[in-house]
Amino acid sequence: MPKDKKEAIYTIPLSRVYWGRRTNRAARAIKLVRKFIARHFGVKEEDVIIHNNVNEYIWSRSIEKPPRRVTVKAVKDPETGKVKVMLIRESKIQQGQATS
């Protein structure tokens, strides 16, 4: 697969962050998004810029319960070589209610 893409839409599965301990799942989800985009665009992880909307969406249910997947749009700037990651679709996440 060529790594000279300019723009792409991805649904990134974040279920892998649930394997570890609960206390830093959202932070690991951000790192996973960065690593995923870097791998698919052929750039370093330092060259991936995550938009604030993506960060807020992942942290929306606190540090322990990030969403299972996130759909993002990644755009590569040909001049700087940096990739910007933006949220494309935000599904409604609601806190679960206790059932009796």
UniProtKB/Swiss-Prot annotation:
Keyword presence, Ribosomal protein: yes
CDD domains, sorted: Ribosomal_L31e
MF-aspect GO terms: structural constituent of ribosome
InterPro entries: Ribosomal_eL31, Ribosomal_eL31_dom_sf
UniProt keyword annotations, A-Z: Ribonucleoprotein, Ribosomal protein
Keyword Electron transport listed: no
GO cellular component: cytosolic large ribosomal subunit
Single biological process term from Gene Ontology: cytoplasmic translation
NCBIfam families documented for this protein: PRK01192.1-1 (NF002258)
Family: Belongs to the eukaryotic ribosomal protein eL31 family.
HAMAP family documented for this protein: Ribosomal_eL31
PANTHER family the record matches: 60S RIBOSOMAL PROTEIN L31
Protein name in UniProt: Large ribosomal subunit protein eL31
Species of provenance: Hyperthermus butylicus (strain DSM 5456 / JCM 9403 / PLM1-5)
Organism lineage: Archaea, Thermoproteota, Thermoprotei, Desulfurococcales, Pyrodictiaceae
